[in-house]
Amino acid sequence: MLDILLLRKDPASAIARLETRQKPQPFLNLSAFQALEAERKTLQTRTEELQSRRNQLSRQIGISLGQGDPGSADTARAQVAASKLELAQSAARLEQIQAELQTMLEAVPNLPHDSVPVGADASGNIELRRWGQPASPAFALKDHVDIGRPLGLDLDLGVKLSGARFAVMKGQIARLHRALAQFMLDVQTGEHGYTECYVPYAVNAESLKGTGQLPKFESDLFSTKKGGQDGEPVPDNTALYLIPTSEVPLTNFVRGLVLTEAELPIRLTAHTPCFRSEAGSYGRDTRGMIRQHQFDKVEMVQIVHPATSYQALEEMTGHAEALLQKLGLPYRVMSLCTGDMGFGAAKTYDLEVWLPAQNSYREISSVSNCEAFQARRLQARFKNAQGKNEPVHTLNGSGLAVGRTLVALLENYQQADGSVTIPPALRPYMAGIAALRP
């Protein structure tokens, strides 16, 4: 959530930065916001006046009674009663206005950092660097579906069990999928300093509001809202949502906390399934495992001091790159433009891995600095050197998406005979097996 003080003091600057996101709809009705703000200020001033007047009259009652003047005391009591009524009405309206302002702010995305390239969509993203050279084998390349089926990938069974965009893995390929997740966790915890966590796969609405998925992106979530006993709807305050990413529970670890500077940075990681309805993705990546309703991911989250958050962004991007390099997978790093960034991000780097069958790079990790945007929603703060409570900065990133890494391994390490070479870094997790064979 944006700092409301910025919108009060310099709304033109905030709107100008928001407009660089280049979306068709306005993010904030500025005139409505300013009208509510004007009423809030008037009511706040009047409320303070009424409180002061009530306190003054209450003192006067005591003085009048002490002086043996019950008539004056009765007059003061009547005035106190009238001021209490007006005070209650003012307080109720003030609470309503603050709720309306909160709702407005919850719909406004984060301000892009000044270093983010300006653009309308993915075509405006800027390539920063590449690593690795895509191979050019002499044999005809297959995609991960054709490679994976003889190795235990069963998409038809996924459809039978659950519907489109679900997959079943058996035998060798299931083992490789598990090995990838274990490898990623071991690197993140053993080399990069993250604390491994086991988290719930279903969270409450407050957790999703804290990280920014609710209320704006509810259509992309799976929930229990319509799954009550005997078909009765579940009230919103008791509904649970399947996590779209373990960023949600991990970042919510610090919801409502006031940390010390000594506790920062906090580095957390978790391997979880992720669940997304993929609303708006109809017709995209319908073949194979690129875009699934359920997929596994190892997530990185850092909670840091504001002064070090952009250093942490570079560090986390390097942590994701290290995994791809250990696996020998060619990739490139993209700086996302203003129009392609996520709702809560101030700056994002995407890592895109080379997929030979598509002859293109595809996203395998997204690493974002949300600055204080999530922290304000979460009321996650630390006590700074001046002794004041200040929002922390939060960052998150994939380290990595397990299914897409599996896809990249199958396609980049495929052999002419249909086998798939296991990269050396993974062999300890595969009991020394050097290749998967049909």
Swiss-Prot record:
Record GO cellular component, one term: cytoplasm
Keyword Aminoacyl-tRNA synthetase found: yes
EC number from the UniProt entry: 6.1.1.11
UniProt KW keywords: Aminoacyl-tRNA synthetase, ATP-binding, Cytoplasm, Ligase, Nucleotide-binding, Protein biosynthesis
Localization: Cytoplasm
Top-rank taxon: Bacteria
This protein's record includes keyword Nucleotide-binding: yes
Residues at which ATP binds: R276, S277, E278, E363, I364, S365, S366
Pathway(s) per entry: Aminoacyl-tRNA biosynthesis; selenocysteinyl-tRNA(Sec) biosynthesis; L-seryl-tRNA(Sec) from L-serine and tRNA(Sec): step 1/1
GO molecular function, one term: ATP binding
Pfam families: Seryl_tRNA_N (PF02403), tRNA-synt_2b (PF00587)
Cross-referenced HAMAP family: Ser_tRNA_synth_type1
Function: Catalyzes the attachment of serine to tRNA(Ser). Is also able to aminoacylate tRNA(Sec) with serine, to form the misacylated tRNA L-seryl-tRNA(Sec), which will be further converted into selenocysteinyl-tRNA(Sec).
PANTHER family in the cross-refs: SERINE--TRNA LIGASE, SERYL-TRNA SYNTHETASE
Record remark on domains: Consists of two distinct domains, a catalytic core and a N-terminal extension that is involved in tRNA binding.
UniProt subunit comment: Homodimer. The tRNA molecule binds across the dimer.
Protein name listed in UniProt: Serine--tRNA ligase
Organism: Verminephrobacter eiseniae (strain EF01-2)
Protein's gene: serS
